[in-house]
Amino acid sequence: MNTTVKRIDPASLNLKEQVVAINRVTKVVKGGKNLSFSALVVIGDPSAKVVGYGVGKAKEVPSAIRKGIEAAKKNLRRINSLDTTIPHQVLGVFASSQVLLKPASPGTGVIAGGAVRAVITACGVPNVLTKSIGRRNPHNVVKATIVALEMLRDRNTVAEMRGLAVEKL
């Protein structure tokens, strides 16, 4: 199965970045302890419905964040959503983290925890209800949220997949 993914050019987008987590990592060696940092960064363009995440590691926090942003630009994905909310309920699973996304009526806003909120606001969904189930590790929660967003299908896509007219759904 040859699936080619069309790469999204980050230069043409108005990307906003958000740091989700910064970890201080210590490696114990013979001469003492080596201190470094890792940063989990989410970037997205709300108007283009594009989101991506990246992890950067460096000896200093700003360098780790910069590397995370560069990694996220190589990992951009387009999201199917309506203007006001998501088309249907979906459950995204990554490792032992699960993220449940539900459509919400206009005016509800984004009801979400830290890592899920960063992804949802980065991709520009204005009204959604979320629930994080299982482990709350920020890395896995971000990945589970993106898995859930990738599973979204609008009416036209479902009709095309089933070979039906949109009116028959």
Curated annotation (Swiss-Prot):
The keyword RNA-binding applies. SUPFAM superfamilies: dsRNA-binding domain-like (SSF54768), Ribosomal protein S5 domain 2-like (SSF54211). The lineage of its organism: Bacteria, Pseudomonadati, Acidobacteriota, Terriglobia, Bryobacterales. The N-terminal domain interacts with the head of the 30S subunit; the C-terminal domain interacts with the body and contacts protein S4. The interaction surface between S4 and S5 is involved in control of translational fidelity. It comes from the Bacteria. One of its GO terms (biological process) is translation. NCBIfam families: rpsE_bact (TIGR01021). It comes from Solibacter usitatus (strain Ellin6076). One of its GO terms (cellular component) is small ribosomal subunit. This is Small ribosomal subunit protein uS5. The gene is rpsE. Gene3D superfamilies: 3.30.160.20, 3.30.230.10. Keywords: Ribonucleoprotein, Ribosomal protein, RNA-binding, rRNA-binding. With S4 and S12 plays an important role in translational accuracy. Located at the back of the 30S subunit body where it stabilizes the conformation of the head with respect to the body. Pfam families: Ribosomal_S5, Ribosomal_S5_C. GO terms for molecular function: rRNA binding; structural constituent of ribosome. PROSITE patterns: S5_DSRBD (PS50881). The keyword rRNA-binding applies. HAMAP family: Ribosomal_uS5_B (MF_01307_B). InterPro entries: Ribosomal_Su5_D2-typ_SF, Ribosomal_uS5, Ribosomal_uS5_bac-type, Ribosomal_uS5_C, Ribosomal_uS5_N, Ribsml_uS5_D2-typ_fold_subgr.
